Amino acid sequence: MSYNYVVTAQKPTAVNACVTGHFTSEDDLNLLIAKNTRLEIYVVTPEGLRPVKEVGMYGKIAVMELFRPKGESKDLLFILTAKYNACILEYKQSGDSIDIITRAHGNVQDRIGRPSETGIIGIIDPDCRMIGLRLYDGLFKVIPLERDNKELKAFNIRLEELHVIDVKFLYSCQAPTICFVYQDPQGRHVKTYEVSLREKEFSKGPWKQENVEAEASMVIAVPEPFGGAIIIGQESITYHNGDKYLAIAPPIIKQSTIVCHNRVDVNGSRYLLGDMEGRLFMLLLEKEEQMDGSVTLKDLRVELLGETSIAECLTYLDNGVVFVGSRLGDSQLVKLTTESNEQGSYVVVMETFTNLGPIVDMCVVDLERQGQGQLVTCSGAFKEGSLRIIRNGIGIHEHASIDLPGIKGLWPLRVAADRDTDDTLVLSFVGQTRVLTLTGEEVEETDLAGFVDDQQTFFCGNVAHQQLIQITSASVRLVSQNPQNLVSEWKEPQGRKVSVCSCNSRQVLLAVGRVLYYLEIHPGELRQTSCTEMEHEVACLDVTPLGGNDTLSSLCAIGLWTDISARILSLPGFQLLHKEMLGGEIIPRSILMTSFESSHYLLCALGDGALFYFSLNTDTGLLSDRKKVTLGTQPTVLRTFRSLSTTNVFACSDRPTVIYSSNHKLVFSNVNLKEVNYMCPLNSEGYPDSLALANNSTLTIGTIDEIQKLHIRTVPLFESPRKICYQEVSQCFGVLSSRIEVQDASGGSSPLRPSASTQALSSSVSCSKLFSGSTSPHETSFGEEVEVHNLLIIDQHTFEVLHTHQFLQNEYTLSLVSCKLGKDPTTYFVVGTAMVYPDEAEPKQGRIVVFQYNDGKLQTVAEKEVKGAVYSMVEFNGKLLASINSTVRLYEWTAEKELRTECNHYNNIMALYLKTKGDFILVGDLMRSVLLLAYKPMEGNFEEIARDFNPNWMSAVEILDDDNFLGAENAFNLFVCQKDSAATTDEERQHLQEVGLFHLGEFVNVFCHGSLVMQNLGETSPPTQGSVLFGTVNGMIGLVTSLSESWYNLLLDVQNRLNKVIKSVGKIEHSFWRSFHTERKTEPATGFIDGDLIESFLDISRPKMQEVIANLQIDDGSGMKRETTVDDLIKVVEELTRIH
């Protein structure tokens, strides 16, 4: 068997449907967005979109419609999934808890029936009498909407028009009436039928129209007063209602195909239309009032409003604001203006929502050399094409920086009385202190009355009773704010120097060697309340009040030298409440008591970058739940700051980290800065909600990203990226991309828009010795679009396009690798191509081109003609392995810098994917699943070891380990095949056994080994081995990792228990959702644990957790079993969440 854990690192981001209505209450205007399996619910507010809830569906959302049956005060939601689960959902809120109730559900799949090529269509009668579904050719399925029906029952009506393009219910008809566009051998036609619920039959509709435009593809039902329907084609827009027929053919819509529409007004007088190029149009219906008071349509008009992301769906919200949902680029919130701008556009982008989809290719690189992978993806398509750099961590955006070496501490001050923003920054150096005044964004050095500037400051801040405090090694100085002068000074009775200190607004804690002093701050006075001597020297201490800023802390935390301990003492009496031996020889350097999400913690950082953290009981001072993580390699300084009204901790070190709490568990997110020695929060007029950070040489002021797990940076290319690879020696990426050009009258072609390949710093064009002249006997005609393919060389730091190389006419780039070949020390970029002509079923010729990039120049070193398309290439033991149509071929690199064929393997339909490990080669075929080859170096040939005999249409493959091979196929499933080395017969050995099956519900385009997280974070490492990331069409990033059998069995047990406790939205069974499903077969999932379900354990209430673990046995580490506690399982699941 093979045991794997699959989990989401980034949820899908591509929007495939959006609707607006009153779902959460009758007064709220809601926007609902479907992102494959996820449903996001927002309320539209004057400030923008406010997220209300996100729901994970056990299915791919195929249809999503709001409707309001009679007797309901707010809208209900109808959802149909790709596996034909239908449900009607209602929003229920009681207090803080939000529930999505399933009012009715059912599965509407037919045992037989051919799924329609134009996909699933779901529509609801405007009078809410029925739901209509077109799932299969020749059938129209009806779900009657009866009020108290808990089960959705459906019946089919035969539809003699087999090929339906689009269908809608018409408004205000006595009986429910459908209007549809269909195709037959004569062309496309429009027809209407009435649906009879009693007879379960169609009867003749009110009107029909034969021979509409050949490309007619969309029906829009128009409400009263007009009624009827609008038919949208490639070149024309027509209106019908039985008596009236009106057609227009505006040239403006011909350039591209309209793909989505949305009604603006309730009376249907304006519609938004979006096309494949991202243009947004307004369709206006002009009315004419008749003598008898009725309204008829006078004219149709189309106006171009401007450009948006390429829209998959549009929805008009309110006040001229439109949500543009995109699958190929970022989604947007745009405002329509009454006046156009200089470019003639009426569209203003208000907000952008990141979308990584479609992820076509990706690679993992450690650019910052911090031992952490970053994922660089080829995302989007056409004008939305981009590279996305995805890092696990938090970004700091620099707003100002000053060269100031040697900073030893920094603190914000509000010097002027009664200010609520900081106006001063105090910086401490060895032997001196400097004060910077902040006015707006200007910074200048000043002096502060009552402060000393010839000593190093240990702490400085605003304290109670409108006073400031400065603590140096010599004394504690209390300064009044108004007038500003020294009012009290405390010195150590024997005149010894203060070694460490901590201070809040009313208390001061100081250590002088082993002696602790406790002072309280009063108006104009520092009062020493108590002192005590510890058995060792004090290394660090903290007196942060956990009740809030103005309260007294009844506890203090101390870290000691010599015995390496952390202690909790009471104040003011210094009674020892808890002593925790940290072990080892590294002293604690920073200690901090803090609260996250109303849970109290003690954090203690050591001099080697390790951090211990404990739960702290503030009543007893006891520590529990000891855990340890490694944050860096140098001493760490802990400081709290607030961001978006939550408390976070910044750990300053060589690997700066933000510590925050999510769902009551601590998350450690690294920050995109090389090194931070000291930091403090800063909230001044010129720099609101900022952080001041110091490293060895510089002071930086910046703002911090939203505290979240993944940080995404976008590099727009404005053309389609296809493949990416990284070349360390030249510190750049190679990217294959294609742009669209339009054929002009002279036979040449010109780009549609500026993009990465037309704006590079330098460029070159292929001229092949192999294909002389234009190889194109296939002429393209004037105005036709052609694809132009390029290799882009992109700088790894600035992401600037340094060079672009344009390939031949009709030459498509398919594969790319950066590698060294043979004994040649040079690292090359190698590109595989195909000559693509419209009249050839598959390419008959292509090239492998070897490039060298050096000092800003790209040279063609070698090219090799091949008889087919070079679908995939990998470096293989110093040679080049390529798959060309159905052949797998190995090339060696000669001393003359030429590619020479060494051996071939021919037994494939179309070899699309190659992965290698040692001498083994995994081949992914178009339709014949996967095949394992071994290269025999002595004989110089390939041997076929084993293959999977199941017909899987592959989309990506990866080698997990020597015996296990991972595949993704085109029905959104994952599977694992295993090599059976122990089999007794040759025949059994030649079969790869399918030992893992899982329905992912995502189309995987690429697998690659690598991880997004720092390795070795926890003390107990998670029970997983290896890490394979994958990227999907919907922009999801997932991870597959392997488990031991005992861990698999434990998690499988937990998974089954969770399924009993967690109720799914729409009442879809988890086992049904995850079962491996193709047109040929459905089999239960096996060999995979659903990590998303396991992680949801952390989000359920404690009583529910208790229910899950009842009588669950866990291994105590010595091979003995014992009953699991809730905290045991929380710890296990938390460890698992840290792998992504």
UniProtKB/Swiss-Prot annotation:
For this record, an example GO cellular component is: site of double-strand break
Alphabetical UniProt keywords: Biological rhythms, Cytoplasm, DNA damage, DNA repair, DNA-binding, Nucleus, Repeat, Ubl conjugation pathway
Origin superkingdom: Eukaryota
| Keyword tRNA processing tagged | no
Q: State the residue spans of region: WD repeat beta-propeller A.
A: 13-356
Q: Where is this region: WD repeat beta-propeller B?
A: 391-708
GO molecular-function term, one example from the UniProt record: DNA binding
UniProt pathway: Protein modification; protein ubiquitination
Enumerate the Gene Ontology biological process terms: DNA repair; proteasome-mediated ubiquitin-dependent protein catabolic process; protein ubiquitination; regulation of circadian rhythm; rhythmic process
Q: Does the keyword Cell cycle apply?
A: no
Localization, per the record, is: Cytoplasm; Nucleus
Gene3D superfamilies for this protein: 1.10.150.910, YVTN repeat-like/Quinoprotein amine dehydrogenase
Region ranges (WD repeat beta-propeller C): 709-1043
Entry-linked Pfam families: Beta-prop_RSE1_1st (PF10433), Beta-prop_RSE1_2nd (PF23726), CPSF_A (PF03178)
Taking the first listed entry, what is the main subcellular location of this protein, grouped into a coarse class?
cytoplasm
Q: How does it assemble?
A: Component of the UV-DDB complex which includes ddb1 and ddb2. Component of numerous DCX (DDB1-CUL4-X-box) E3 ubiquitin-protein ligase complexes which consist of a core of ddb1, cul4a or cul4b and rbx1, and a substrate receptor, such as CRBN. DDB1 may recruit specific substrate targeting subunits to the DCX complex. These substrate targeting subunits are generally known as DCAF (DDB1- and CUL4-associated factor) or CDW (CUL4-DDB1-associated WD40-repeat) proteins.
Its annotated function is as follows: Protein, which is both involved in DNA repair and protein ubiquitination, as part of the UV-DDB complex and DCX (DDB1-CUL4-X-box) complexes, respectively. Core component of the UV-DDB complex (UV-damaged DNA-binding protein complex), a complex that recognizes UV-induced DNA damage and recruit proteins of the nucleotide excision repair pathway (the NER pathway) to initiate DNA repair. The UV-DDB complex may recognize UV-induced DNA damage and recruit proteins of the nucleotide excision repair pathway (the NER pathway) to initiate DNA repair.
Any notes on this protein's domains? The core of the protein consists of three WD40 beta-propeller domains.
Q: Which family is this protein grouped under? A: Belongs to the DDB1 family.
Give the protein name, as stated in the record: DNA damage-binding protein 1
Q: Coding gene? A: ddb1
